[in-house]
């Protein structure tokens, strides 16, 4: 059994802990601002690491593609241009004809002249 002095010491220590903790027996529900900021920074850091890892894998795939001796097609002028003149000309069967609704809209625009 504990003596009265030991019991008093334990009670004083428990009272000091409760007084200094100031939780009033309730669980602490709020997080401090610094803890929230730390969690936010950790999330941003993890997403940044994921992006870097994804980019590293893609660059490794490109490097492997070139290392395997795959032929790289070089373009003249860097843009895709039609090779024949006929590719530039619109075929009349593919041209859009004005429907009745389009003609009505054009008539309204012609009649509403700005002053």
Curated annotation (Swiss-Prot):
Which positions form S-S bridges? none
Say if the entry is tagged with keyword Acetylation: no
Protein name, entry field:
Parathyroid hormone
What is the top-level taxon of the source organism? Eukaryota
Q: Which InterPro entries match?
A: PTH, PTH/PTH-rel
Q: Which residues form the propeptide?
A: 26-31
Gene it is expressed from: PTH
Q: What does this protein do?
A: Parathyroid hormone elevates calcium level by dissolving the salts in bone and preventing their renal excretion. Acts by binding to its receptor, PTH1R, activating G protein-coupled receptor signaling. Stimulates [1-14C]-2-deoxy-D-glucose (2DG) transport and glycogen synthesis in osteoblastic cells.
Note whether Signal occurs among the keywords: yes
Q: Spell out the GO cellular component terms annotated for this protein, sorted alphabetically and separated by semicolons.
A: extracellular space
Indicate the secretion signal residues.
1-25
Stretches for region Disordered: 75-98
Q: Which UniProt keywords apply?
A: Cleavage on pair of basic residues, Hormone, Secreted, Signal
Q: Where is this chain's protein located in or outside the cell?
A: Secreted
Please give one Gene Ontology molecular function term for this protein. type 1 parathyroid hormone receptor binding
Please give the subunit comment from the record. Answer: Interacts with PTH1R (via N-terminal extracellular domain).
């Amino acid at each position: 059994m504990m003596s009265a002095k030991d019991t008093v010491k334990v009670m004083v220590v428990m009272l000091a802990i409760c007084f200094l903790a100031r939780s009033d027996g309730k669980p602490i529900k709020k997080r401090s601002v610094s803890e929230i900021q730390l969690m936010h920074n950790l999330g941003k850091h993890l997403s940044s690491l994921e992006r870097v890892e994804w980019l590293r894998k893609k660059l490794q795939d490109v490097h492997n593609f070139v290392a395997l001796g795959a032929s790289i097609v070089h373009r003249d002028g860097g843009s895709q241009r039609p090779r024949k003149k006929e590719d530039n000309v619109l075929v009349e069967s593919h041209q859009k004809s004005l429907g009745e609704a389009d003609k009505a809209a054009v008539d309204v625009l012609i009649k509403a002249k700005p002053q």
